[in-house]
C-alpha cells in the first residue's frame, strides 16, 4: 500500500524522479551477475488482478492460492488488509516462483515485478482534489541492469513489460 507523502517532500524520496518523456537505462538478462538477486526477501504487495493471473497460471483455486502463497496483513490505520506474496522458507527468502532459469510465472508476474526498477505512486493535491502519477527509477544498489545501455521512456517500458493492462486493473 502507498504511503502518503507531502508534496514538498517528494524530492527527498530515494531514486530519480522520471517524467513521461524522460529516459532511463535498464536491461535485465541472465548474463548480468546479479540475475534473480532482486527476487528475494521482498515486501511484494499483490493486487486483485495479480492474484487472478497467478492463480490461473498455476491452475489453483483462489482459496488454494491464497493459502499457499499469500500473507494477509491488517495494519491498524488501514481499512483494507495488505495482501503480500509469501517468500519461500529458505535462507535467502526467495520468491516462491523463482527457479534456476528465472521466474516460472513470468508471463503472469505481478504488476510490481513488471514495473521494476520503476516505482510508482500518486501525487494527491488536496486543494484541487487531483491525483497525478509519479514514477521513480529505483534499482537496488547491487543491480547491474542499470548500467546496461538499453534506453527507455516510461510508456516504452510499460509496453515492453506488458504492464498497461495491469496498470488499468490496479490503479482504480
Predicted regions and their residues:
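Short loop/turn segments that flank or connect secondary-structure elements
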Residues: 1-172
